[in-house]
Amino acid sequence: MTLVSFFSFLSKPLIMLLSNSSWRLSQPSFLLVGIPGLEESQHWIALPLGILYLLALVGNVTILFIIWMDPSLHQSMYLFLSMLAAIDLVLASSTAPKALAVLLVHAHEIGYIVCLIQMFFIHAFSSMESGVLVAMALDRYVAICHPLHHSTILHPGVIGRIGMVVLVRGLLLLIPFPILLGTLIFCQATIIGHAYCEHMAVVKLACSETTVNRAYGLTMALLVIGLDVLAIGVSYAHILQAVLKVPGSEARLKAFSTCGSHICVILVFYVPGIFSFLTHRFGHHVPHHVHVLLATRYLLMPPALNPLVYGVKTQQIRQRVLRVFTQKD
């Protein structure tokens, strides 16, 4: 299934739902400002964003291709990595094309339903990425703490079920976002001070009651991120405890190195995301263009950097990438 057909497959049920006659489809289109206050510099800002998007496309497609073509990589660690790469492709492609169009060719208008669909994709796949990071932490825990039972605990059937749980969780928890927004009335300006349809930026434009929208958004952020970070923390606490019992510093270092790439990916995803979330909701003295830059780059940095992290720090991936690009025939 291609990326375009995947978008179409997931979008059709949402479009049908949003097209229901009970929805306020008379709402006008939104206008995406881009980076407020930096209009004269937007072409230059688009350059690093375009580079990040290109890195995300090339890197994640390469990861998927290598894992797909090499049967020796059809193990839990690499299957979870392929899930992460697929999610990153969708996440980056949900944000970057429209953001770049706004910054480069001033295509500011975005349809009401298209805006809600983009918002759903961004938040749903961010939730899925967080879920996959939890699954990867579980994989590292089993590999280090129960190495003899790793293949029996995390066999392909279990991995498939974990992937399905991650997918369903992301869809079910985030589908209320566009549904709740569809009940709001936008009777004033519909100018979004972002380069994409950010949830709270759209909620703030409504002139009807938004308490439920705000409460649900905050609850989902705390629930998803809070529980996922807790699960990852517990996994690594057990890993640390097990590694410290390993005799010999070299053996301990080798055990830690197997977790290095995953820890880097966790930091790349959660640290900027939590910082962006906190500054957006509580950083009232932070300039708005800083909010927008943080939020936009946060959505593109993990998809761009994750393949580089795994390419550099994972020997099997690195060797196969070099083999692909150095083949004579």
Swiss-Prot record:
Residues on Cytoplasmic side: 65-72, 139-157, 236-255, 313-329
GO MF entry, a single one: G protein-coupled receptor activity
Compartment(s) where it occurs, according to its Swiss-Prot or TrEMBL record: Cell membrane
Disulfide bonds: C115-C207
Membrane topology: Multi-pass membrane protein
Task performed by this protein: Odorant receptor.
Name by which UniProt lists this protein: Olfactory receptor 52L1
Biological source species: Homo sapiens (Human)
